[in-house]
């Protein structure tokens, strides 16, 4: 492995792997180290939210992830009085939306997500250095020097940038002197385990409410096991043995016909709710659980970390290739407020779960992360009124029924791959952009752009169903610059090409 990578990534969970993929597909030299001797077992965070599925679509792994999971898994909850409530359906407000390709969460084990990310990384020429630990590091104005230990052998690596995606106990965060603000609530504990189950069907996520707390069994797609979750009261035995798990299950369900097998993996979760006061110190960054940890209620943690990496990756690559380093200041400015909002949401969900002795079976739009955006960021520029539904900084919506030279496509099919995309309604503008950095798409026909032409050229779009004009609230002059991470950088309804040119010039 090179001793002078541009980026050293510490921690090869979902966040670190996503960042490595972002760099690899842009040909940025990196090293990805992981202290564990091999891939981590355990389902852990098992819920993939729709916005994260869009990230995986962009990275080229969504089909693999979907193949090993289940969308909108039914939920069956037995109440304190024995009443059974069914839920888990796709939110009504999100059904048949051409701007949203994935409308509800996917259940899949976290190790399957890591597996798909490692496979894609290998296809891009990258790999994980397992059994390699960060000992310490120092930084200067020009670089970071890190001491690594691999099997007792130490070496110094010099990198331009260091990213700590090494979890809640992050060595990178601690050695950077970054405060991890928040609290540990020892009274809120939960046993989590992966195990085989007899006497229970796999057609739903089963939950039971009880005065002493909830217990649940969720079938894990693409495996033969369930994820067991059982809350533990203060002072209650938190033994991870099969006998204790079986005892808790029988006491809270009143059923002795459900038989658990020896856990393949288990852990005791405690409520740690914390947020780093900074995401960056000089040439060192934090991402994922190293920067924020919270309750699993609402299924936000892994998703937020993956989206941290999706935000940081293209910016690091741009700076490595000559963009101003000030671009990297926008990482904390954009992502830390998102994490703060996630903590607020997950805390509210946790309080509801504790109060009601179990979590809700109703899915809604609050957790799917499609409303996450960066309005007000220095990377968000538009000439629209503040009351406009779509503004710069928002997630770029999808659209269906687009006729191109290659047949019918979704918009996300055309924007995939991690480049800027300039979407114009009407005649394509002349901005002199490098086509290796920006993709040019022009809506040349449809409700907002006139009659269908007899010939469709490369890059031209016929908006046959009017979905793209509607999603972007476009006129025949509108220009939309979509960032590499799928958020809107510029909207100009007046068709001002200077706004786009100035924006792109700042990235050079």
Q: Model-derived features: where do they sit?
A:
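Active-site-adjacent segment of FAD-dependent monooxygenases/related oxidoreductases
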Residues: 41-44, 48-116, 120-122
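A conserved short coil-to-beta-strand element within the FAD-binding core of flavoproteins
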Residues: 130-144
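Glycine-rich FAD pyrophosphate-binding loop
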Residues: 24-45
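Core beta-strand elements of the Rossmann-like FAD/NAD(P) dinucleotide-binding domain
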Residues: 3-5, 152-161
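Helical substrate-recognition/capping region of FAD-dependent monooxygenase/halogenase enzymes
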Residues: 2-6, 10, 25-26, 35, ...
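FAD/FMN-dependent oxidoreductases across multiple families
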Residues: 68, 239-300, 304, 338, ...
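Conserved FAD-binding catalytic core of PHBH/FMO-like flavoproteins
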Residues: 119, 161, 165-271
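N-terminal Rossmann-fold NAD(P) dinucleotide-binding loop
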Residues: 16-17
């Amino acid at each position: 492995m090179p001793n002078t990578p541009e980026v050293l990534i510490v921690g090869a969970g979902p966040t670190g792997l996503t960042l490595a993929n972002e760099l690899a597909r842009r040909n940025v030299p990196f090293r990805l180290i992981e202290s564990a001797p091999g891939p981590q077992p355990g389902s852990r965070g098992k819920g993939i939210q729709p916005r994260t599925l869009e990230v995986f679509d962009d990275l080229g792994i969504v089909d693999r992830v979907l193949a090993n999971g289940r969308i909108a898994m039914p939920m069956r909850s037995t109440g304190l009085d024995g009443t059974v409530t069914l839920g888990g359906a796709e939110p009504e407000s999100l059904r048949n939306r051409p701007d949203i390709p994935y409308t509800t969460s996917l259940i899949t084990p976290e190790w399957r997500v890591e597996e798909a990310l490692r496979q894609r990384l290998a296809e891009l020429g990258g790999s994980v250095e397992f059994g390699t630990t960060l000992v310490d590091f120092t930084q200067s104005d020009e670089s970071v020097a890190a001491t690594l230990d691999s099997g007792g052998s130490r070496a110094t690596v010099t990198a331009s940038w260091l990213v700590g995606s090494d979890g809640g106990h992050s060595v990178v965060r601690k050695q950077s002197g970054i405060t991890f603000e928040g609290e540990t609530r020892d009274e809120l504990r939960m046993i989590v385990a992966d195990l085989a189950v007899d006497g229970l069907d796999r057609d739903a996520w089963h939950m039971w409410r009880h005065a002493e707390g909830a217990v649940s069994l969720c079938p894990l797609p693409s495996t033969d096991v369930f994820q067991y979750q059982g809350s533990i009261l203060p002072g209650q035995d938190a033994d991870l043995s099969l006998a204790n798990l079986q005892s808790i299950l029988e006491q809270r369900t009143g059923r002795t016909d459900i038989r658990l097998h020896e856990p393949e993996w288990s852990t005791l979760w405690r409520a740690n709710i914390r947020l780093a006061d900074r995401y960056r110190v000089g040439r060192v960054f934090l991402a994922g659980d190293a920067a924020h940890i919270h309750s699993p209620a609402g299924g936000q943690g892994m998703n937020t970390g993956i989206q941290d990496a999706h935000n940081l990756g293209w910016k690091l690559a741009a700076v490595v290739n000559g963009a101003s380093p000030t671009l990297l200041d926008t990482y904390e400015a954009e992502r830390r407020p998102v994490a703060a909002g996630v903590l607020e949401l997950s805390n509210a969900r946790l309080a509801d779960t504790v109060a009601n002795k179990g979590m809700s079976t109703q899915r809604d739009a609050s957790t799917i992360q499609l409303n996450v955006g960066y309005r007000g960021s220095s990377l968000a520029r538009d000439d629209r009124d503040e009351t406009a539904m779509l503004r710069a900084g928002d997630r770029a919506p999808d659209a269906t029924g687009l006729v191109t030279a290659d047949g019918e496509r979704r918009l996300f099919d055309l924007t995939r791959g991690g480049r800027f995309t300039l979407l114009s309604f009407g005649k394509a503008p002349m901005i002199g952009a490098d086509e290796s950095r920006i993709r040019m798409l022009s809506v040349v026909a449809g409700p907002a752009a006139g009659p269908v032409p007899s010939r469709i050229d490369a890059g031209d779009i016929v908006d046959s169903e009017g979905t793209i004009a509607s999603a972007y609230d476009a006129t025949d002059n509108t220009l939309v610059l979509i960032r590499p991470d799928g958020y809107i950088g510029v909207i100009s309804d007046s068709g001002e090409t200077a706004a786009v040119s100035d924006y792109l010039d700042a990235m050079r």
